[in-house]
Design a protein with these regions (language model features):
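Bacterial N-terminal signal peptides that target proteins for export
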Residues: 1-12
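Transmembrane beta-barrel domains of Gram-negative outer membranes and organellar outer membranes
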Residues: 25-253
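C-terminal segment of classical bacterial N-terminal signal peptides
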Residues: 17-25
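Intrinsic low-complexity, intrinsically disordered segments enriched in polar/basic residues
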Residues: 5, 15-18, 38-40, 164
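Terminal low-complexity, poorly structured segments
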Residues: 12-16, 212
């Protein structure tokens, strides 16, 4: 892909970010918390966004543009911007992240990648957290896969370190529909018990074409506040021209 085409895609992603609402930092695959090991083709871009509302009246809105570059091997660079209300207080954070695939996924074999990043308060510039995670994916067949996440989180606001964990299952049960269920969380010491309790999400993704998909998700305790959540998410993709469709390469939506 030429430099001009790459700049055009990045500009489009940033333009969409300018008007999409944004939410609580989540280093993940769209609105799902457990990431897969796959990344897109070098030169491709996408914009993920989602709105989440909790029974506790907490609210989260997120926009996450990303592009895959190839300085020495493909690396996915993303800049998640989040705007959220928790216990009646609003906050905005920015979360840069870089993800690299180490071993490709395939049917009957384990693939894995590595990502790392941090989060910052958009108003004060304060460094809020740092994290590093290894996502692994085992494809059972062309339509089912298991995702495993393990990593580290440093919550600088309370100066505590946590072990991150997650397991998820994806099933593409039609050409346009995929079901996901996942459990995840962080292990360590916390003054708030719900922060270290397991978290849960399940939802359905509808992808009618190569460009657009939408997710509808139910979640429990997804940000450590012991509430029920409903999330509506979308993804807009900017594939490499004349490239093989993503779901043919990965088997999933």
């Amino acid at each position: 892909m030429g430099i001009g085409a790459g700049c055009t895609k990045i500009a489009a992603a940033v333009a969409i970010l300018a008007w999409l609402p944004a939410g609580k930092a989540r280093a993940a695959n769209g609105a799902y918390a457990v990431d897969a090991a796959d990344i897109g083709e070098a030169g491709s871009c996408k914009v993920e966004s989602w709105l989440s509302s909790a029974s506790s009246t907490d609210f989260t809105a997120v926009a996450n543009p990303s592009c895959v570059v190839n300085p020495f091997r493909p690396v996915e660079l993303s800049m998640l911007t989040s705007h959220s209300r928790s216990d009646g207080e609003w906050g905005t954070t920015i979360q840069p992240k870089a993800k690299m695939n180490i071993a490709p996924t395939g049917v009957g074999k384990l693939g894995f990648s590595f990502y790392a990043g941090g989060s910052f308060d958009a108003l004060t510039g304060e460094n809020l957290s740092a994290f590093a995670v290894i996502p692994a994916t085992f494809r059972l067949n062309e339509t089912m896969r298991l995702n495993f996440n393990g990593g580290w989180l440093w919550d600088r606001s309370v100066d505590r370190h946590y072990l991150l964990y997650g397991i998820g299952f994806d099933w593409k049960f039609t050409d346009t529909l995929q079901w996901t269920i996942e459990a995840f969380g962080q292990a360590g010491q916390s003054d708030t018990p719900s922060v270290v309790r397991p978290r849960f999400q399940t939802g359905v993704r509808y992808r009618p074409n190569e460009i657009f998909s939408v997710d509808l998700i139910y979640g429990r305790n997804i940000s450590g506040e012991n509430a029920n959540w409903i999330t509506l998410g979308t993804t807009i993709r900017f594939p490499v021209p004349d490239s093989k469709p993503e779901h043919y390469r990965t088997g999933h939506l």
